[in-house]
Amino acid sequence: MSEVLPYGDEKLSPYGDGGDVGQIFSCRLQDTNNFFGAGQSKRPPKLGQIGRSKRVVIEDDRIDDVLKTMTDKAPPGV
């Protein structure tokens, strides 16, 4: 998991004129490779691969009945 750490003591700068005001400091993320998740590390598809889909297996016992009733009925307005 990423840790948020300050840049260093030389990067710290006081904020405001009063001594009772806190300090604002910059911070950075360590190990940002996994920050956006695994999906970001994929390469974009090649031009010939755009629009091609993988085969999908439908595991529904009723799909044959549903598809049959859809083809038997005429769409409304036709």
From Swiss-Prot:
Oligomer status and interactors? Interacts with CAMK2B; the presence of Ca(2+)/calmodulin increases the interaction but is not essential. Interacts with CAMK2A; this interaction requires CAMK2A activation by Ca(2+).
Q: Is the Methyltransferase keyword given for this protein?
A: no
Name this polypeptide is given: Calcium/calmodulin-dependent protein kinase II inhibitor 1
- Organism classification: Eukaryota, Metazoa, Chordata, Craniata, Vertebrata
Q: Name one GO biological process term.
A: chemical synaptic transmission
Q: Does the keyword Disulfide bond apply?
A: no
Region CAMK2 inhibitory domain: start-end pairs: 41-68
What keywords sit in the KW lines?
Cell projection, Protein kinase inhibitor, Synapse
Its biological purpose is as follows: Potent and specific inhibitor of CaM-kinase II (CAMK2). Plays a role in the maintenance of long-term retrieval-induced memory in response to contextual fear. Modulates blood pressure and vascular reactivity via regulation of CAMK2 activity in addition to regulation of left ventricular mass. Mediates the NLRP3 inflammasome in cardiomyocytes via acting as an inhibitor of the MAPK14/p38 and MAPK8/JNK pathways, thereby regulating ventricular remodeling and cardiac rhythm post-myocardial infarction.
Disulfide bridge map? none
Q: Name one Pfam family in it.
A: CaM-KIIN
Listed GO molecular functions? calcium-dependent protein kinase inhibitor activity; protein kinase binding; protein kinase inhibitor activity
Q: Name any GO cellular component annotation.
A: neuronal cell body
Q: Where in the cell is it found?
A: Synapse; Cell projection, Dendrite; Postsynaptic density
Tissue expression remark: Brain specific. Highly expressed in frontal cortex, hippocampus, olfactory bulb, caudate-putamen and cerebellum (at protein level).
Lineage, top-rank taxon, reads Eukaryota
The family this protein is said to belong to: Belongs to the CAMK2N family.
Please give the InterPro entries that the UniProt record associates with this protein.
Camk2n
Gene null: resulting phenotype = Knockout in a spontaneously hypertensive rat model results in decreased blood pressure and vascular reactivity to N-omega-Nitro-L-arginine methyl ester hydrochloride. Increased renal and serum endothelial nitric oxide synthase and serum nitrate levels. Reduced fasting plasma glucose concentrations and a 23% decrease in visceral and brown adipose tissue relative mass, resulting from a decrease in adipocyte number.
